[in-house]
């Protein structure tokens, strides 16, 4: 029996996964190819009856219980009529599949395919559709009960812990790291003054950038809930604002157009569920947590290590300071 050298990460064979899909699911003529490496490796499976997404999670980043919670959330959203990419059961009614890989047990889930394409600059109709769909998702995510394995989005998890995690990477950038610390302290102080007990809470997707939803005409599908956790639901609207701010910075939108776009999204959202002015006022402050949280994640994942090198961190800090001038 061969003895393999220990590994922390392996990439599963696309052809072997295609054969597995044919045996495990009611799929025929499966062609499988790797799309992207991330927290989970994402494969496109093309079959005789349609396309599907296969995600193989990394055990270092997602536990079995955390993946089960994601499955439960998406099935609840689908049951409620929310347009999401949802888990597909196999011949035996199972959604979660263990694989014995070199680094240990990995888990895989097959998802429905999100038709259409990402749209970077949304028109008025698309903005309203997105606002409605996020609100419908929040109607589910604010009431669903899961297994307790997911994390919470709060100042500790979005600011303090990520900053501590990336501190070694800022060793040669003391001024930049000082700015992050001061900005985090200012944000925490400001948010503490808000009456957060009156903010709607539930499970947040925390990454509603255009790369995570597709439009096919006026039909919208939300996907990639891998980072979802519990927190103020306005965090999800904040992530849309983050993208609009980037559009302004890179000259794709004027500041006035970005403001109008966000107002359209909020108006549509409020047609489905309430949203207070205080929650909206928190958006610029919550934005720092978005950038800090994902910066911390980049330091934990080898694929993203180039993003935490000194040159990248210096450029990223300069960008965030321009995007968030109130800090």
Where are these regions (language model features)?
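Active-site activation/catalytic loop segments of kinase-like enzymes and analogous catalytic loops
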Residues: 234-273, 288-304
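ATP/Mg2+ or Mg2+-diphosphate-binding catalytic cores
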Residues: 3, 293-327
């Amino acid at each position: 029996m061969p003895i393999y050298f220990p590994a922390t990460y392996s990439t599963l064979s696309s052809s072997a996964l295609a054969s597995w899909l044919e045996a495990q699911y009611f799929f025929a003529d499966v062609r499988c190819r790797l799309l992207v490496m991330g927290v989970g490796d994402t494969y496109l499976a093309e079959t005789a009856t349609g396309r599907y997404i296969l995600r193989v999670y990394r055990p270092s980043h997602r536990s079995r219980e955390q993946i089960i919670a994601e499955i439960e959330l998406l099935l609840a959203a689908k049951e409620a009529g929310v347009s999401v990419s949802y888990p597909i059961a196999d011949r035996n009614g199972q959604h979660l599949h263990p694989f014995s890989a070199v680094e240990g047990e990995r888990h895989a889930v097959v998802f429905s395919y999100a038709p259409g394409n990402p749209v970077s600059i949304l028109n008025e109709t698309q903005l309203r559709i997105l606002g409605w769909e996020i609100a419908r998702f929040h109607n589910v995510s604010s009431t669903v009960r899961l297994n307790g394995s997911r994390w919470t989005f709060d100042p500790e998890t979005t600011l303090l812990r990520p900053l501590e995690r990336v501190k070694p990477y800022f060793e040669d950038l003391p001024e930049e790291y000082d700015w992050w610390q001061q900005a985090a302290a200012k944000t925490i102080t400001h948010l503490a003054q808000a009456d957060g007990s009156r903010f709607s809470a539930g499970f947040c997707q925390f990454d509603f950038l255009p790369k995570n939803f597709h439009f096919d005409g006026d039909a919208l599908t939300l996907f990639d809930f891998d980072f979802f956790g519990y927190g103020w639901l306005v965090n999800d609207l904040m992530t849309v604002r983050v993208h609009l701010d980037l559009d302004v910075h890179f000259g794709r939108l004027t500041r006035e157009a970005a403001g109008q776009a966000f107002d359209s999204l909020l108006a549509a959202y409020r047609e489905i569920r309430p949203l207070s002015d205080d929650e909206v006022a928190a958006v610029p402050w919550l934005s720092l947590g978005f950038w800090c949280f994902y910066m911390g994640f980049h330091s934990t994942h080898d694929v993203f290590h180039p993003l935490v090198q000194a040159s990248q961190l210096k450029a990223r800090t300069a960008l965030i300071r321009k995007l968030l001038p109130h800090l």
